[in-house]
């Protein structure tokens, strides 16, 4: 599912209805070989009415008294003991109305280069899902990191299909071993643009390859994507669904549409088995026209636009995308629902049976035809989950630079400045999209963690950018009134002195309360003010001079409960949700309106209007620099949500440069979703990329900074020197970008994505794919390559830990192009073929064998549309990154 479409449940249903009126007939693809359902499933299909079959292949609305605000639901058939199913969003974690584990980001997990860690991640997600009464998790996300401008690039497992597919397969195994179905997404080429124009070799070798791995791992379901592939919508693309996914790859599970990605009833003939959300007038997998629903109000549309395009104050100076909603398919003629398609003969009952049979087969496989999966919400293993998240976050951290300053010694801690909001609070979630909102009560910063671990009095904190602010004081309000409505009572209106009703102010409102404030805000001077609406236990909105400034919890797609991490980069320091907006105000009076309406959590209602004035911002920045000046060493915590592309928002670059100018022992800790420019790299002594850490990031940072953990994460993406160096951001190839005005992304680079592009074009990256430092060093020797029994290769070598500290090395094997290479076929000069993460004690040597499966030695020929073996005449390269490969051997046979 797609982050920029959070209102899909209502808005997509309206949009898809429009699309249904514009459709053409879909031409069925050739029927691939299919496995027959089991006798039990066949008997069920015989016993089911057409309407009952529809119930298992079409989303619906779970009764309100039972719903967990999950992403989707199918009703089942109680008469035949076929249970209903719940689907929950991700990655990462499990997104429902209940609090659940906040996990490290997917790029952080990818940076572990560890199948053990991937399986642990999947198992944790699976256990949380079962505890929350969820049956199907909408993850792993296995598209390829191709274009940093694509809105979901941060959700990937990196730029390489082998890394992505290998880790994803183990996520699936971990999750499904916990008793939930995994649904890998988004098939296919959902990597940039509404229409991916990609050739058959790149499509199979790069973009479909991870789906082969999860299929081999037994994934229960795959989600087809919003985009078109070569002009045909993914969920109705018989060539990619029935042709590649089922025919070539051999996938045996069921295919579900992304929410609103079906554009015709005939998609059921092309390989799509289940429609989601499946409700409303735009539902295609319905036997007739569904009842109309009230159209979205202008206020709701404005809220959607604001939520999708308004960033935090640090981000608002940069151009943000205009949310245009889902693409409307210009394809007139396709049936508006299955009832119409059956009458026209474009769909048959056999098509419905086939789709229902695939879904029922997976239910049978998971034992859900013998008994219903439990939908009871039970206690999660909070402490156990926290230990796993902390370990994975530590193992996914990448040390990009270290000039001998890390790890800090005990003496360093006697005078250490910790600077930035990330020093006080961990950047656990940051994005607030299709993932668990985490446990804000566990999310302490590195400053608190280091104090607890070391008991040092020399740790100094300066946030530099105060994201909480201070309550707007009573003196800044005039004629302020509050209308308070308690549950079941009439509103009581009276004068108010401020808007500060929280636990901290000892004035919180009772559960179920709603309140409206109206009055005048008195602004002391012209300037850019950060105005923050802070809530818990309620949804809210606020206006200045009649203009909507911010809202929180307005979208009920995953329930109305407001979590502390729901609408912000980080919560307030006292654990409230925090909608921060930068507002240019003139000195004098401004009309103000604030509303808070109790959510369904049953929690007391807390409401606060806070601000950060221009003088406050200047003072905080100056205090941070002075704190750094007086310390022996300084650590600056910086963050980004890819707004702007390839940069740190706000004044963070200036802050790092100012701190480094007064303290030569400056370390930077990054919490970013993707690569960022580092104009200050030469001025600092160390850089740690921690990505988004999950709930335990403060402890992670502390352990890494003082050496209780040894960083060994490796980059799953190439870190460019310039944004323009990337394959989809090259100004000479504007047609490749997901943001181009045509809506078409031309994958004209073929297979040369990520590090393959940098190698092909001989571009020097800032940090190469697979790169990462450690607090020790390693050497490689004695490479040998032999044929394996399965037709692949076994690559054996030795790795020695040259230092005085034990550590992990990520060993990587790449294969070169055949020599001679077949004419008309693309090959990477080096392509990752195998990897492992190995632990080596100080001063010892370890023998390592990596296996290269035969599929990674094959290529797809566009000339004859066939896979070919290409083992002979290829070199194998081994080392610690795509640009550090000290060992090589040629395999001749």
Describe each region flagged by the PLM:
Residues 13-24:
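Bacterial N-terminal signal peptides
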Residues 2-15:
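Bacterial N-terminal signal peptides that target proteins for export
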Residues 30-860, 866-883:
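Glycoside hydrolase catalytic-domain context in secreted enzymes
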Residues 884-893:
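Short beta-strand elements
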Residues 25-29:
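Sec/Tat signal peptide C-region and signal peptidase I cleavage site
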């Amino acid at each position: 599912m797609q982050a920029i479409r959070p209102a899909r449940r209502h808005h997509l249903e309206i949009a898809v209805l429009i699309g249904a009126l514009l459709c053409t007939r879909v031409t069925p693809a050739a029927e691939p070989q299919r496995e027959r359902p089991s006798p039990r499933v066949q008997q069920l299909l015989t016993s089911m009415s057409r309407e009952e079959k529809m119930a298992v292949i079409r989303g619906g609305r779970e009764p309100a008294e039972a719903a967990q605000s999950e992403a989707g639901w199918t009703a089942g058939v109680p008469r035949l003991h076929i249970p209903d199913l719940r689907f929950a969003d991700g990655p990462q974690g499990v997104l429902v109305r209940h609090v659940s584990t906040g996990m490290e980001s997917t790029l952080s997990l990818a940076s572990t280069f560890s199948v053990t860690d991937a399986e642990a991640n999947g198992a944790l997600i699976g256990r949380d899902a079962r505890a929350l009464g969820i049956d199907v998790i909408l993850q792993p996300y296995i598209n390829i990191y191709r274009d940093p401008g694509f809105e979901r690039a941060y959700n990937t497992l990196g730029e390489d299909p082998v890394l992505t597919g290998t880790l994803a397969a183990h996520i699936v195994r971990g999750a499904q071993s916990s008793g939930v179905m995994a649904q890998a997404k988004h098939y296919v080429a959902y990597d940039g643009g509404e229409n991916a124009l990609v050739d058959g070799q790149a499509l199979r070798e790069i973009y479909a390859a991870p789906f082969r791995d999860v299929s081999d791992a037994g994934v229960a379901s795959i989600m087809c994507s919003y985009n078109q592939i070569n002009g045909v919508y993914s969920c109705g693309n018989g060539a990619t669904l029935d042709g590649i996914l089922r025919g070539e790859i051999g996938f045996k599970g069921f295919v579900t549409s992304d929410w609103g990605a079906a554009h015709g009833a005939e998609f059921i003939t092309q390989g799509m088995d289940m429609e989601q959300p499946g409700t409303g007038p735009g539902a295609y997998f319905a036997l007739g026209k569904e009842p109309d629903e009230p159209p979205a109000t202008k206020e709701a549309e404005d809220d959607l636009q604001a939520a999708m395009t308004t960033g935090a104050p640090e981000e608002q100076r940069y151009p943000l995308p205009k949310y245009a909603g889902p693409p409307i398919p210009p394809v007139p003629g396709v049936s508006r629902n299955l009832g119409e398609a059956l009458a026209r003969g474009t769909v048959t009952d056999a098509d419905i049976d086939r789709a229902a049979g695939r879904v029922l087969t997976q239910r049978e496989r998971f034992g859900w035809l013998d008994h219903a999966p439990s939908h009871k919400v039970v206690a999660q293993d909070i402490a156990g989950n926290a230990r796993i998240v902390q370990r994975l976050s530590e193992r996914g951290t990448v040390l990009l630079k270290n000039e001998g300053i890390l790890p800090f010694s005990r003496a360093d801690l006697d005078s250490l400045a910790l600077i930035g909001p990330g020093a006080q609070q961990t950047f656990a979630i940051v994005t607030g999209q299709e993932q668990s909102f985490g446990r804000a009560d566990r999310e302490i910063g590195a400053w608190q963690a280091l104090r607890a671990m070391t008991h040092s009095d020399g740790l100094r904190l300066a946030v530099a950018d105060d994201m909480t602010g201070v309550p707007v004081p009573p003196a800044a309000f005039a004629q302020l009134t509050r209308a308070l409505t308690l549950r079941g009572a009439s509103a009581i209106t009276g004068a108010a002195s401020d808007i500060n009703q929280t636990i901290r102010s000892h004035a919180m409102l009772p559960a179920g309360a709603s309140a409206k404030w109206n009055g005048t805000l008195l602004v002391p001077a012209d300037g850019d003010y950060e105005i923050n609406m802070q809530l818990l236990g309620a949804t809210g909105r606020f206006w200045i001079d009649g203009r909507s400034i911010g809202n929180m919890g307005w979208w009920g797609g995953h329930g109305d409960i407001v979590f502390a991490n729901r609408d912000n980069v980080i919560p307030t320091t006292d654990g409230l949700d925090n909608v921060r907006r930068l507002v240019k105000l003139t000195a004098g009076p401004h009309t103000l309106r604030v509303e808070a309406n109790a959510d369904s959590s049953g929690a007391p209602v807390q409401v606060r209007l806070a601000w950060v004035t221009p003088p406050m911002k200047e003072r905080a920045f100056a205090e941070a620099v002075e704190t750094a000046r007086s310390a022996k060493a300084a650590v600056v915590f910086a963050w980004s949500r890819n707004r702007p592309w390839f940069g740190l928002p706000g004044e963070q670059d200036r802050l790092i440069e100012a701190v480094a100018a007064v303290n030569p022992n400056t370390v930077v800790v990054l919490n970013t979703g993707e690569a960022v420019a580092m104009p200050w790299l030469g001025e600092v002594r160390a850089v740690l990329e921690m990505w988004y850490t999950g709930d335990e990031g403060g402890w992670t940072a502390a352990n890494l900074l003082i050496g209780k953990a040894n960083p060994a994460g490796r980059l799953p993406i190439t870190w460019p020197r310039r944004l323009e160096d990337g394959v989809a951001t090259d100004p000479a190839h504007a047609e490749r970008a997901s943001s181009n005005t045509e809506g078409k992304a031309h994958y004209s680079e073929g297979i040369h994505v990520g590090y393959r592009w940098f190698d092909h074009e001989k571009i020097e990256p800032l940090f190469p794919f697979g790169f990462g430092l450690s607090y020790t060093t390693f050497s490689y020797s004695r490479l040998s390559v032999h044929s394996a029994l399965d037709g692949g290769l076994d690559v054996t070598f030795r790795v020695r830990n040259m230092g005085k500290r034990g550590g992990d090395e990520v060993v990587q094997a790449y294969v070169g192009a055949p020599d001679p290479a077949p004419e008309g076929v693309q090959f990477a000069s080096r392509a990752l073929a195998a990897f492992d993460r190995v632990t080596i004690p100080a001063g010892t040597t370890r023998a390592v064998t990596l296996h290269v499966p035969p599929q990674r030695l094959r290529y797809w020929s566009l000339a004859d549309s066939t896979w070919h073996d290409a083992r002979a005449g290829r070199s194998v390269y081994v080392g610690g990154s795509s640009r550090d490969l000290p060992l090589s051997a040629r395999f001749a046979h």
